[in-house]
């Protein structure tokens, strides 16, 4: 090619958009077209936290759900000017984009039950990605073979009282597919309806899939939104709960009675609400370790009976709050018979905050020592098995050692 007085514009072409499943890679260099192929091409991601791209090879690695722009640049020379184009790359979390899915673990019947608000806007479903169908009765039963998949959809933000029961199954996909009015569940992070997903999996023989995840992605919660969600189910591992600002009663009894639950989710919320965690893990008799509770400002009855009856629990979370609120730790570890240590750094009490909080804790024959670790500034603790309603006593049961020891008067 002969030299030109002025270089001409580069020809650089690439798809407007590519989708890369989270955790996988995609080679952009294979879809980039240019005339001046000998000139160096470079790649740059607008947000490497979502998706990285190798600067020279163009290999994209999807890290977390989201969207980035990858800028593709080509060097100029005496014949061609520098050129640029942009590709929109979706790093897609497959489970976040897939609607709530129940996969039968064995042959049997799956029941879909609609009561009250769940009847005001239809719940729809597909079996094995077939035709969309609509639940027309209060109780609707599907005959499934092992491996059959049922996907569920609804635009009812106030769903409430929709319950799944029957055959043993794996649950994965995004629960927001049931309560997204615009059908855009993969981007919906807000629950707007009272008790929207209450009792959803209650009493169900439900298990965690070996490679898929059940997604509860909401960061904006509504009162009672997840209450009793897995009540008395066979769930063995809880899904992630990303919300950092809670609503009243939002997790009430969410996993209560899940006797197979061995692993609790991380609870990173800093802003609590009345009874937000009340009864959350009550009766989870296989749970041995409690999740950390980082919040330092408490709310009325926020942790009431949270771990009540967790007879296998040996590790309690550190209770960092200095100021207690009405009923905040009431019955929190009641019946945790294998618990042997609690760290409570509170210095200011509140009515009923410690009522019954360690009743029956550490009473198993395997427990040889029981220790309450206190804040050094708080010397009001005393061993006492009594509890009177409406008091603000610093009581820890007899048989528990207070550490550091309370100085003699």
Model-derived regions, located:
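Solvent-exposed loop and capping/linker segments of extracellular ligand-binding repeat ectodomains
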Residues: 1-4, 90-409
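Extracytoplasmic soluble-region selector
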Residues: 2-93
């Amino acid at each position: 090619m002969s030299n030109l007085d002025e270089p001409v514009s580069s020809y650089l072409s690439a798809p407007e958009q590519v989708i890369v499943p989270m955790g996988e890679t995609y080679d952009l260099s294979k879809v980039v077209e240019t005339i001046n192929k000998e000139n160096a091409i470079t790649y740059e991601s607008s947000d490497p936290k979502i998706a990285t791209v190798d600067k020279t090879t163009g290999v994209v690695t999807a890290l977390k759900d989201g969207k980035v722009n990858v800028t593709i640049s080509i060097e100029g020379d005496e014949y061609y000017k520098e050129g640029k184009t942009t590709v929109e790359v979706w790093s897609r979390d497959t489970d976040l984009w897939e609607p709530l899915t129940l996969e039968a673990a064995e042959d049997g019947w799956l029941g879909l039950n609609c009561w009250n608000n769940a009847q005001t806007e239809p719940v729809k479903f597909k079996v094995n990605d077939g035709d969309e169908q609509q639940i027309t009765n209060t109780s609707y039963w599907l005959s499934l073979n092992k491996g059959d998949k049922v996907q569920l959809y609804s635009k009812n933000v106030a769903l409430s009282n929709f319950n799944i029961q029957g055959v043993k199954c794996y649950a994965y996909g995004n629960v927001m597919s049931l309560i997204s009015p615009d059908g855009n569940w993969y981007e919906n992070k807000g629950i707007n309806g009272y008790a929207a997903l209450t009792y959803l999996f209650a009493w169900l023989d439900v298990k965690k899939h070996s490679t898929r995840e059940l997604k509860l992605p909401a960061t904006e919660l509504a009162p009672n939104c997840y209450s009793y969600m897995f009540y008395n189910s066979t769930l063995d591992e809880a899904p992630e709960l990303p919300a950092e600002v809670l609503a009243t009663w939002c997790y009430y009894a969410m996993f209560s009675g899940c006797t197979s639950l061995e692993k609790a989710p991380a609870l990173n919320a800093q802003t609590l609400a009345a009874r937000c965690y009340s009864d959350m893990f009550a009766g989870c008799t296989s749970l041995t370790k409690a999740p950390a509770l980082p919040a330092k400002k408490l709310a009325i009855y926020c942790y009431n009976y949270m771990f009540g009856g967790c007879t296998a629990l040996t590790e309690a979370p550190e209770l960092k709050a200095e100021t207690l609120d009405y009923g905040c730790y009431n019955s929190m570890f009641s019946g945790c018979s294998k618990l042997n240590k609690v760290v409570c750094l509170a210095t200011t009490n509140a009515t009923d905050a410690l009522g019954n909080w360690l009743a029956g804790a550490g009473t198993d024959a395997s427990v040889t020592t029981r220790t309450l670790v206190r804040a050094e500034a708080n010397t009001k603790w005393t061993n006492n098995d009594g509890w009177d309603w409406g008091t603000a006593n610093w009581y820890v049961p007899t048989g528990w050692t207070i550490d550091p020891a309370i100085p003699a008067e």
